[in-house]
Amino acid sequence: MPLPDFHVSEPFTLGIELEMQVVNPPGYDLSQDSSMLIDAVKNEITAGEVKHDITESMLELATDVCRDINQAAGQFSAMQKVVLQAAADHHLEICGGGTHPFQKWQRQEVCENERYQRTLENFGYLIQQATVFGQHVHVGCASGDDAIYLLHGLSRFVPHFIALSAASPYMQGTDTRFASSRPNIFSAFPDNGPMPWVSNWQQFEALFRCLSYTTMIDSIKDLHWDIRPSPHFGTVEVRVMDTPLTLSHAVNMAGLIQATAHWLLTERPFKHQEKDYLLYKFNRFQACRYGLEGVITDPHTGDRRPLTEDTLRLLEKIAPSAHKMGASSAIEALHRQVVSGLNEAQLMRDFVADGGSLIGLVKKHCEIWAGD
């Protein structure tokens, strides 16, 4: 399929997607019943969309195009109410978190969807292993060239986004020692990590044309980059966050990305170059492994900075943009999180250290989601 023209959208508008876990009490393993839930709610959702993701244990909640995080929060709240009622009616529960702590990938059923079945044919067991749960945020752009500039700008802060949302320390019944283990699942995919370097939309069109020669890439949706342009929506999509345990944290993360995008496209503080990416995967690894306790390295100067310190610096820089976007509350909440040193990954570990089981952890996550 040829790459569509870049659809011009209103700059800095938002679209947010949350991949949720569908679980079966009282054992709290992943269910295989998302299709049943989607059928139950499809006529009751008035704004946004509830739809499939890769496997039958995943339920995606997606907003419509939103002006700001308050509108997005309202849509999510309404969807949450409908989904929780339908889940209760079918003896299921819903929770966030980037991974389910003890599910077995071999049990996951890929949805009966043409694209997902084609992806299963291409990637085999990797698709079942990709039963992990992320938050994606789309930001509107006025042109393809703006989208490429924004993508490179946001890529500088991928470690910050990962660390602030880290919520996947457990996988396959084991403490991974990572704050966010979810991104590691995609490391075997040939398109994992950052987008190959291009400097404008024309070069991106040539890149996509080259990728399509492999026959594995039919559309942008077949690319698993950390951040990708979405020409059919007219957006840049950030894909590195774990699904948070609460709606409020998900909305705060979206506000962070919206405000950062506004700062980047308004101030144009960087002259992007390919060398910016030399240490990308090392810095990304630091965030996945250690969260905000990680250390990032500047590829141009060699300077090393604690991620906590650099995140506080980012929040300060984007505060005026956050005010203009109506996202000041999000930046203030994230600032409190960084200063306090609290994060969802550590809270999960604390629960287990205090004697809680992994089954009890999932049950707790369901209670948190329903109570937010």
UniProtKB/Swiss-Prot annotation:
Keywords carried by this UniProt record: ATP-binding, Ligase, Nucleotide-binding
Biological process according to GO: modified amino acid biosynthetic process
E.C. number(s) listed in UniProt: 6.3.2.2
Q: Name one GO molecular function term.
A: ATP binding
Catalytic activity of the protein: L-cysteine + L-glutamate + ATP = gamma-L-glutamyl-L-cysteine + ADP + phosphate + H(+)
| Superkingdom classification of source | Bacteria
Question: What InterPro entries does the database record attribute to this sequence?
Answer: GCL_type2/YbdK_subfam, GCS2, Gln_synth/guanido_kin_cat_dom, YbdK
Broad class of enzyme this protein falls into: ligase
Which intervals of the chain form a coiled coil?
A: none
Record family assignment: Belongs to the glutamate--cysteine ligase type 2 family. YbdK subfamily.
Q: What task does this protein carry out?
A: ATP-dependent carboxylate-amine ligase which exhibits weak glutamate--cysteine ligase activity.
> Quaternary structure per UniProt?
Homodimer.
Name of the protein described by the UniProt record: Putative glutamate--cysteine ligase 2
